[in-house]
Amino acid sequence: GQVGDDPFGRALMDTLRQEKVDVSRLRLSDMYQTTLAFVHLDESGDRSFSFYRRQGADTMLRTEPADFKAVEQSRVFFFSSVMMTESPARETSFALAAHAKERGVVTVFDPNLRLNLWAGEAEARDCILRAMPFADIVKVSEEELVFLTGETELRRGAAVLYARFPMKALLCTLGAKGVLALAGDEIIARDGLPVKTVDTT
């Protein structure tokens, strides 16, 4: 990943270090600033986002030979469409996801759709669907499932997406309603637990 060599980027790096996260491949850019995300909570604790991201350090991430080596040495490679909204980070994401898949590293994809980061819905949908073949495990929200398949009936939408791509498992998070999972021939549904929502971020 990449953050700016600024107070925000250094604070993120320090926080990750304190939590014992390996930041050896996290780059500090002196050319681009750290992207900022502002979370807005409504009365029910649900959230929306605003981004300060024009040429953010994360969107300007380019691959280096050591990145591919780091992927090979990983047990799991996680990627998200947030890194695919702009180039060159888009090409970087696809290159590293493809490399992980080729080397047998477990790949996990969360579309994490933020439409306000994309030029338009068609571009977002196309890019997310292009990423699906690289994923062993996919995690989508109910809204993302409708966005990607056009199906408003949950189980049908999940079945359509699961059948279309070579994933091993599909997890559909449903907020307070729980989760639906498809893996092999199994379909597993679990209700959510009744809790007071504070912050869904």
Q: What kind of region is each of these model predictions?
A:
Residues V106, I137, K168-A169:
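Proline-centered loop/turn at the N-terminus of a beta-strand
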Residues A98-E102, E151-T201:
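Conserved phosphate-binding/catalytic region of the ribokinase-like
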Residues Q2-F79:
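Conserved N-terminal subdomain of the carbohydrate kinase-like
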Residues R17-V21, A122-F147:
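Structural recognition of alpha->loop->beta junctions
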Residues K69-A70, R130-A131, A163:
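Structural alpha-helical scaffold elements that stabilize or flank donor/cofactor-binding regions
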Residues R54, V82, N112-N116, E143, ...:
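Active-site beta-loop-alpha junctions enriched in small/polar residues
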Residues K20, E102-G104:
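Glycine-centered short loops/turns at secondary-structure junctions
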Residues V23, T107-F109:
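Hydrophobic beta-strand scaffold residues
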